[in-house]
């Protein structure tokens, strides 16, 4: 047979195969496509009609591709929560035609839910709970068994000696299911429904709510909208819905169209929920406080804003949040889908809810769910797509937040500063600045003045100094940032000027590190330090002055004289303190340079975290504690240490797995005799390395714990001092004690530190409680720490 004829026959066989049964992968792709698109509203026909066609299409091949169809439906249930009722209707229609299929779907979903909970994917597991409950509306599951299923969640929440955050999650899951299944349970499983309502009420009564003040964006009583705990708010919304006989207009119930078919279908019983065993390494979602910004009067539109305790408000926010989550890596598609959602719901001012949700996420405590740059770019994209309406909504948003800034948590002010400065940089820093000039006369710890001052400073970092000053009204001169130039304080009359000239000449001659070390050697026999500390300060001053032209020049100087700096700084802690003091003295008016160089010194291991923290909380630096840059540097240093510990922990985990794997191989006798010695040597080496890593981790964790304790003690002392010494002289106004703006600001910064490093500090909470908050601690500050501890209570 010729090669050409053979190839032709093979091609013919391939073509026949393609015309015949398609490959499994192709079938799955086609199924995924048709099932995934059944809820699309732009197909030219109704969703009900699409469901009917899809049911007929799937039923024909149900036995052949059952497993694939079930997997795809399960994926839709988990990852498309906005189409719950679409897919529960589909499952209901298929169950009416094939009873076993409905049972297989339920079995698959139950298994998936358990797996998701074990993987700590709590949102996805909650999506499945809602889906399973809604199957009761589409004739797949009995109302009685769904009631028992929800009761088992409540039973899990009442288990003893469990973290409250775990119990909260199970109660929240029950409450989130009720908008879908509440009416059905009330009509067909009244006893279970009453048990659920009673148990939820009992749980909320006995629940600890210490965390609520700490997670509020604004201090209690400072706004006309209550900042409620998320469970309390959802419970009130559900109670109002129940009072209204479960009537709401947001959830589309496609199964009602097929009631005649679905009501005759055989139903399955949903097994009771079995909660995974709790272990100490399980991390549950933090509690939340509901963010509210707008009331109906703020919107000024014909459509009415749902009230805070309306279930529609919850459902709108949930759908907006899901659209953002789904598109968190694509701002353009996110903005388009948000606008499409607003167009689909003309009866409500969805634009206001979109901005309220975005800023609620941006200001969420303890952590925002997405990087700041995503929210920044999403807002810009929304303004671009809706230029006639959304800029006005954004202006109202900013004005409302600014008007409440005096009672705002400092950590939230920081986030608003970061967003607003970035936003203004896209509009040449133009804004209605004159409307805010009244806050310039406020004291320097006033939240509104801090916000305005820090926004201007951040804008200066993003643009030129001259451009920022030109954009500001003349009234703002009091809070203008200083010109960002280096401060060189050595002149001819200075006693150290001669030494400065010597160092300048040595730098120009590019002399080696040894020459500088020799020059810095102390000549005083009574000096306990090996190097003259004042001359070291002069050396650093001259180096920074000569390298002050650009960031690159500064980096180059640090790398060139790294050996000199490191040798001196390793000799004693005082040299690290002197280096940082000199750096601050030179670059005080350029906070960005100060932050970048401090970070670079940490990365080069010339200084360590403890020296940075000690410097920032030295009494001489208290004057800077109303500035954002200081806490940015602090958090950078502490996060760097935490990351280093995380790396060592990962190394230990990897080494442990290696050692255990080799031990199993050795014990099983799978190693050849001639290779046994080599394997034993490798195992011994890895075990020694593992022990060394464990010892290193113990040292690092101990260092971290002591560092947090020391600086928190220093911070508490400063706050206590602020409570007793506030006066007009220190910029804190004429109100003294714990009501002064300075005290409230510093206490807010204390909460900021706790929240920014929540995961780490919660591990050391018992040590902090013992070392920092012993007898005699200020109750105002102790209360902050008690609230913090309840986050994982």
Curated annotation (Swiss-Prot):
<keyword id="KW-0507">mRNA processing</keyword>
<dbReference type="Pfam" id="PF09088">
    <property type="entry name" value="MIF4G_like"/>
</dbReference>
<feature type="domain" description="MIF4G">
    <location>
        <begin position="28"/>
        <end position="242"/>
    </location>
</feature>
<dbReference type="InterPro" id="IPR015172">
    <property type="entry name" value="MIF4G-like_typ-1"/>
</dbReference>
<dbReference type="GO" id="GO:0006406">
    <property type="term" value="P:mRNA export from nucleus"/>
</dbReference>
<dbReference type="InterPro" id="IPR016024">
    <property type="entry name" value="ARM-type_fold"/>
</dbReference>
<dbReference type="GO" id="GO:0005846">
    <property type="term" value="C:nuclear cap binding complex"/>
</dbReference>
<dbReference type="GO" id="GO:0003729">
    <property type="term" value="F:mRNA binding"/>
</dbReference>
<keyword id="KW-0508">mRNA splicing</keyword>
<dbReference type="GO" id="GO:0000339">
    <property type="term" value="F:RNA cap binding"/>
</dbReference>
<dbReference type="Pfam" id="PF02854">
    <property type="entry name" value="MIF4G"/>
</dbReference>
<dbReference type="InterPro" id="IPR003890">
    <property type="entry name" value="MIF4G-like_typ-3"/>
</dbReference>
<protein>
    <recommendedName>
        <fullName>Nuclear cap-binding protein subunit 1</fullName>
    </recommendedName>
</protein>
<dbReference type="InterPro" id="IPR027159">
    <property type="entry name" value="CBP80"/>
</dbReference>
<keyword id="KW-0539">Nucleus</keyword>
<dbReference type="GO" id="GO:0006370">
    <property type="term" value="P:7-methylguanosine mRNA capping"/>
</dbReference>
<dbReference type="InterPro" id="IPR015174">
    <property type="entry name" value="MIF4G-like_typ-2"/>
</dbReference>
<dbReference type="Pfam" id="PF09090">
    <property type="entry name" value="MIF4G_like_2"/>
</dbReference>
<dbReference type="GO" id="GO:0008380">
    <property type="term" value="P:RNA splicing"/>
</dbReference>
<dbReference type="GO" id="GO:0005634">
    <property type="term" value="C:nucleus"/>
</dbReference>
<dbReference type="GO" id="GO:0000184">
    <property type="term" value="P:nuclear-transcribed mRNA catabolic process, nonsense-mediated decay"/>
</dbReference>
<keyword id="KW-0943">RNA-mediated gene silencing</keyword>
<keyword id="KW-0506">mRNA capping</keyword>
<dbReference type="GO" id="GO:0031053">
    <property type="term" value="P:primary miRNA processing"/>
</dbReference>
<comment type="function">
    <text>Component of the cap-binding complex (CBC), which binds cotranscriptionally to the 5'-cap of pre-mRNAs and is involved in various processes such as pre-mRNA splicing and RNA-mediated gene silencing (RNAi). The CBC complex is involved in miRNA-mediated RNA interference and is required for primary microRNAs (miRNAs) processing. In the CBC complex, ncbp-1 does not bind directly capped RNAs (m7GpppG-capped RNA) but is required to stabilize the movement of the N-terminal loop of ncbp-2 and lock the CBC into a high affinity cap-binding state with the cap structure.</text>
</comment>
<comment type="subunit">
    <text>Component of the nuclear cap-binding complex (CBC), a heterodimer composed of ncbp-1 and ncbp-1 that interacts with m7GpppG-capped RNA.</text>
</comment>
<comment type="similarity">
    <text>Belongs to the NCBP1 family.</text>
</comment>
